[in-house]
Amino acid sequence: MGNCDSRELAEQTKQSKKINTELAIAKKDDENVIKLLLLGAGESGKSTVLKQMRIIHNSGFSQEESMTKRNVVCANTIQAMGALIEGMRQLRIDFVNRICNAHEKLIRETLSENTEYNPFNDAMYTALSDLWADKGIQSAYGKRELFYLADSAKYFFDSLARINEPNYIPTENDILHTRVPTMGVIEVKFQMKGKVFRVFDVGGQRSQRKKWIHCFDDAKALIYVASLSEYDQVLLEDNTTNRMQESLQLFKQVVNNKYFVNTSVILFLNKVDLFEEKIIIKKRSLTIAFDAYTGPQEDVEAAITFIDSKYRAMADNKDKNIYVHKTCATDTHQVQYVLDAVLDTILSSKLKGCGLF
């Protein structure tokens, strides 16, 4: 399973080196170039925001490029099932359908041996379908906040038949749901109203963060992506640290960094759809992450307002303007609306007083 991920990561590394070289050569951008830095903790959705910029402001993904994502879709689907099985075992939940024990063995062997599927063979397709239909797996999925599981798991499980079609080509929505950790720096470049925007996405995992700061001291604005729905989840890296608390600490480091004192900050509170589901349907209290929260337990707006205040409080300079937007990064229309508002604000120089121009 690691082969397709390795190819994707190798390409990221190649592009990252190229970008770093360009940054070293041209430290200061031309006045017609606006450099934006896209930051956020791992799995916040920042790479999805970057993909949306390609879709909205560039030509999106070519058919050839989309075809190369088939491996990633298949890998993400099998990896998600492996994580779901692992979570089920941690919770001591058993399969209802006994055949799923054999399917579990296939999943584990596939993950350990890095077997690649494109598309799934009959055995893997049957295994994934039977497992997703099993009541034990569904019970574990209902408790997914207790273990690590990618947000895209259900999306891909519900699309198994389509993904397994011989002529399957990943759609833009499929690509938006794929997940390969960002290693190094990835860039999207586009033009808007006579300006060239260069947007840089940098690795969000702990091991990646120290690599980017010095390269972007001339960024015009920071877009920090924070996942609202991670308040009841732990980090993939250590499986103990609360994800939202980690994101807050990273935001604190960024917003107070000496390189970004005069840089405007735009905060995307992302995954609002998943957040609403947890607050309203699953009734997962915000007090899981914040003992101090005393607002209504099933009031999404009250909870978001509280989280908003927590992020703003991270800035040592209380006069620093932080522009906040609620987003669902997989919703192209919603992201387009937010991005247009953000970019128009930048172009109209409304952020001039905060050092944008």
Curated annotation (Swiss-Prot):
Lipid-conjugated positions (N-myristoyl glycine): G2
Q: Pfam families, per this entry?
A: G-alpha (PF00503)
Question: Segment G1 motif: which positions?
Answer: 35-48
The annotated region (G4 motif) lies at 266-273
Please report which protein family the annotation says this sequence is part of.
Belongs to the G-alpha family. G(q) subfamily.
Record function comment: Guanine nucleotide-binding proteins (G proteins) are involved as modulators or transducers in various transmembrane signaling systems.
**Name of the protein:** Guanine nucleotide-binding protein alpha-1 subunit
Origin species: Caenorhabditis briggsae
Name of the gene: gpa-1
